[in-house]
Amino acid sequence: MTNLKNLRGMLDLLPAQSQGWQKVESIALEHFSRAGLQEIRTPILEQTELFSRGIGENTDVVGKEMYSFDDRGGRSCTLRPEGTAPVARSIIQHGLLNNGPQRLWYRGPMFRYERPQAGRQRQFHQIGVEFVGLASVMSDAEVISIAWNFLKDVGLNDLTLEINSLGSNEDRNIFKEELKDWLNQRFDLLDEDSQKRINVNPLRILDSKNNSTKELLSEAPSLNDFLSSESKTRFDYLQELLVNLKIPYKINYNLVRGLDYYSHTAFEITSDHLGSQATVCGGGRYDGLISELGGPQAPSIGWAIGMERLVILAGDKILQTKSPDVYVIHKGKKAEQLALEITCQLRSSNLIIELDYSGSSFSKQFKRADKSRAKWALVIGEDEVSKGQLLMKKLRDKQKDEESREYIFSKGDLDQLIKKLIA
């Protein structure tokens, strides 16, 4: 019989790794709560139409990368490839904008059929923020600052913020025609993917990773030259706000986002430590998405961070596992019952308690206790039960405290002793 394994690009998150993820999520929860954000959770499975309308029929995501299928009712369904369109759908469906602008965050798995690489899998996880119903440039700056400061809270310092203005729809439409003419004159010099995109999604060519195409694009028309005075004023003010917030940035006029719904502000936060997968956070303004999906006109801005890449970058800063405060060692039937009772009692005091289940000798249990890196071992044997006593032995830093390595005490004094020994 063939051994069953996970699908390619869909990885198990093992206990040694999950603790780092939990740390990042706890930092996110605290950071976003301080920023006044509320969490929203949407289904993993959505109607395919949500993404074809919201993201754009001509994007790589919709055209090449989605996991789509017909369910047993004949409905076309898709495993969500990103989080913004589902959040937009939920806001419209439940009328959340009737209560005013929404400041939301989300987390969860996404799915894209891509070639798996370090930090990029077919099932991947994102944490994202969406400000919906806010048009102010101040909201752009605040959203960027939330991302920047969250990454700092996680412990990342070697980061680069790149920003660009994609202008209004009118700005982009004029620029697209100029860019298409320029590219068509140099068609044979473009890589194959870029040739396919000229008439479908020419702006995406600006983000080409092909070296020869990138070199050619250095002479291409710049979207910045086609921005209206209103769009330029908006972009200038964003830069002023970022300077005031002491957030360093670089302008990248070739920065475009891979989804069609973006306008005006676009940004990425990158790291040199991820190789070709340099982007840690990407986002921008999407003023037309809510109305495109059938809702009211609601200018919005948001971003998403890939958890896999974030955990890789954070490394040892978040992967330090917590050792037990107390490892409970026991031998004998009566001792077993008391050990379980005391374990549950101590856990209710917010302590990390590990209970030995091996039933082996005291010496072997002590070896496991030492391997767990617990600070103390609580020893319960038949003798201790008959005498109504418990024994606490220190496991760490023994050489520093030889005089107080052991404590013998009654069960009634347990809470008081624990408070004394484990501050």
Swiss-Prot record:
The keyword ATP-binding applies. One of its GO terms (molecular function) is ATP binding. Its EC number is 6.1.1.21. It comes from the Bacteria. One of its GO terms (biological process) is histidyl-tRNA aminoacylation. SUPFAM superfamilies: Class II aaRS ABD-related, Class II aaRS and biotin synthetases. InterPro entries: aa-tRNA-synth_II (IPR006195), aa-tRNA-synth_II/BPL/LPL (IPR045864), Anticodon-bd (IPR004154), Anticodon-bd_dom_sf (IPR036621), His-tRNA-ligase (IPR015807), HisRS-like_core (IPR041715), HisRS/HisZ (IPR004516), HisRS_anticodon (IPR033656). It is an enzyme of class 6 (ligase). GO terms for cellular component: cytoplasm. Belongs to the class-II aminoacyl-tRNA synthetase family. Homodimer. HAMAP family: His_tRNA_synth. This is Histidine--tRNA ligase.
